[in-house]
């Protein structure tokens, strides 16, 4: 689908090619204030990232851009110079709110209205997260709640958050298995299909893979806490190998059990004992008297005495 945005000060609109959920199709046909692009703080990097609010925040998508040099799009009878492909992936907005809950707990450590917790001067659009229905329904999974009159107050709960994240990991594992996604140490590329998928992949491999996917939306401390909570061993420290068994060394001299010298023989005796060929036998019978060795013809002549 093609997304459009009006350029300020001109009647021309800016376009992108966007892969997005079907729920965005109606808003794409007609310009609507219900669909908004907003820059929010990414929990993993603590930097700004682009998100898409669909239907007034009923669904939130993370927007990633696939970009290659010298790429354009042909749209109708025009050429779209911006050749990027934007991909909008649905995300649970609680991952974005969780960052502010943890921060407020470290700084104040007390119950507060959620409107005072989700505040960011650098990314003021974060207040839009509170309008999302999934956030209001899921706050109790990661916080302790207090209600005074008609007002609710919240405080981050690490224990409840780990339980909630573990369920997320378990659901992700089910999707990985049902989708036949290759996991484990033997996988070098997600595009490779491994025939022995079921034989050498352990449950721990699925859990570790799912933990890695979920961790892309968590702070570093929470990633480590979740890994310990799931019982995943630390791969940075290698598993100690069992000690090598030492062989007993005897002080008694080593003696040969067999006399190997009997196999030794003089090479000359071997030659004499070897059988002679028919040509050699005939040559031996020839009378060699008066014959000279061939080397005698090449030796220097002796000087005659005067």
From Swiss-Prot:
Q: Which biological processes are named by the entry's GO terms?
A: RNA catabolic process
User: One Gene Ontology cellular component annotation?
Assistant: nucleus
**The keyword tRNA-binding is annotated on this UniProt entry:** no
Which spans does this entry mark as compositional bias, Basic and acidic residues? 259-269
Q: Which InterPro entries match?
A: RNase_H2_suB, RNase_H2_suB_wHTH, Rnh202_N
Specify the superkingdom: Eukaryota
Where in the cell does this protein reside?
A: Nucleus
Q: Which UniProt keywords apply?
A: Nucleus
Chain spans, region Disordered: 232-285
Instruction: Tell me where it mainly resides.
Output: nucleus
Pfam family for this entry, one: Ydr279_N
Instruction: Tell me the protein family, please.
Output: Belongs to the RNase H2 subunit B family.
Functionally, this protein is described as follows: Non catalytic subunit of RNase H2, an endonuclease that specifically degrades the RNA of RNA:DNA hybrids. Participates in DNA replication, possibly by mediating the removal of lagging-strand Okazaki fragment RNA primers during DNA replication. Mediates the excision of single ribonucleotides from DNA:RNA duplexes.
**Could you tell me what this protein is called?**
Ribonuclease H2 subunit B
Native species: Xenopus tropicalis
Lineage of the species this protein comes from:
Eukaryota, Metazoa, Chordata, Craniata, Vertebrata
């Amino acid at each position: 689908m093609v997304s459009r945005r009006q350029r300020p000060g001109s009647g021309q609109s800016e376009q992108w090619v966007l892969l997005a959920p079907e729920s965005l199709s109606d808003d794409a046909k007609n310009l609507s204030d219900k669909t908004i692009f907003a820059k929010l703080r990414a929990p993993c990097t603590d930097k700004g990232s682009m998100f898409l609010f669909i239907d007034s925040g009923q669904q939130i998508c993370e927007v990633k851009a696939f970009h290659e040099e010298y790429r354009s799009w042909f749209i109708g009878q025009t050429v779209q110079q911006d050749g990027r492909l934007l991909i909008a992936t649905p995300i649970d907005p609680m991952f974005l709110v969780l960052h502010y809950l943890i921060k407020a707990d470290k700084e104040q450590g007390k119950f507060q209205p959620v409107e005072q917790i989700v505040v960011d001067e650098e990314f003021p659009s974060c207040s839009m997260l509170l309008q999302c229905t999934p956030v209001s329904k899921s706050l109790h999974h990661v916080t302790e709640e207090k209600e005074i009159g008609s007002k609710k107050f919240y405080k981050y709960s690490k224990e409840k958050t780990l339980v909630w994240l573990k369920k997320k990991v378990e659901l992700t594992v089910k999707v990985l298995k049902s989708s036949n996604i290759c996991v484990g140490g033997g996988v070098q590329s997600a595009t490779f299909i491994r025939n022995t998928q079921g034989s050498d992949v352990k449950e721990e491999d699925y859990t570790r893979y799912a933990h890695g996917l979920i961790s892309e939306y968590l702070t570093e401390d929470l990633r480590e806490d979740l890994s310990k909570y799931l019982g995943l061993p630390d791969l940075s420290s290698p598993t100690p190998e069992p000690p090598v068994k030492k062989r007993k060394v005897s002080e008694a001299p080593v003696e040969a059990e067999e006399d190997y010298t009997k196999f030794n023989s003089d090479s000359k005796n071997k030659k004499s004992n070897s059988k002679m060929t028919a040509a050699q036998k005939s040559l031996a019978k020839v009378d060699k008297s008066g014959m000279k060795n061939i080397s005698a013809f090449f030796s220097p002549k002796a000087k005659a005495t005067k």
